[in-house]
A protein has these predicted regions:
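Charge-rich amphipathic alpha-helical interaction elements
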Residues: 1-152
Length: 152
C-alpha cells in the first residue's frame, strides 16, 4: 500500500510551533500580570499599614514629625500604587494581545489540520479506487482467460 505524504506537512509543523510559542508567550504574559498585581497588593498593604499608623498617632499623642513622615509615606504609596496600576493595565493589555495571538495560531493550526485530514481522506479514496480498479482488471482477466480456454 502506498504511504500517505502530506505535501504541506512542513507548514503544519510550523503552525504547531507558532502555536506553542504563542502559548508560551501567553503564559509569560499571565505570569507577568500576576506579578504586577502582587506588587500592587503589597503597595496597597503598605499604604494601609501607614494609614493605620497615622490613625493611631492622631488618636494618641501629637508627634507632629512622625505624623508628617507617615502622611508623606502615604502620599508616596498613593503615587506608587497609581504607577503600579498602570503597570497592571499594561500587563492586562499584553495578556489580551497574547491571548489573541494564541487564538489566531490555534485557528491557523486547526485549518491546516483540517486540510491534512481532507488530503488523507482523498488519499484513501484514491487508494480504494485504485484497488477496486485492480480487482476489476484481475476479475476481467480471469473471466476472459477462462472464457478463452473454454472455447478451445
Amino acid at each position: 500500500m502506498a504511504k500517505f505524504i502530506y505535501k504541506m506537512q512542513n507548514i503544519l509543523d510550523i503552525k504547531l510551533k507558532l502555536e506553542d510559542q504563542a502559548r508560551t508567550a501567553y503564559g509569560n504574559a499571565v505570569t507577568k500580570l500576576e506579578e504586577e498585581q502582587k506588587i500592587l497588593n503589597r503597595i496597597e498593604d503598605r499604604k494601609a499599614g501607614y494609614e493605620n499608623q497615622l490613625s493611631e498617632l492622631m488618636s494618641a499623642s501629637l508627634e507632629v514629625g512622625e505624623i508628617l513622615r507617615i502622611e508623606n509615606a502615604i502620599e508616596i504609596m498613593n503615587f506608587k500604587a497609581e504607577e503600579q496600576r498602570l503597570e497592571v493595565m499594561r500587563a492586562e493589555r499584553a495578556v489580551e494581545k497574547a491571548r489573541e495571538k494564541l487564538k489566531e495560531a490555534m485557528v491557523e493550526r486547526k485549518i491546516h489540520e483540517k486540510l491534512r485530514e481532507k488530503a488523507f481522506e482523498n488519499f484513501k479514496q484514491e487508494i480504494s479506487a485504485q484497488e477496486k480498479k485492480e480487482v476489476d482488471e484481475l476479475v476481467s482477466y480471469k473471466y476472459t482467460s477462462r472464457a478463452g480456454s473454454e472455447e478451445v
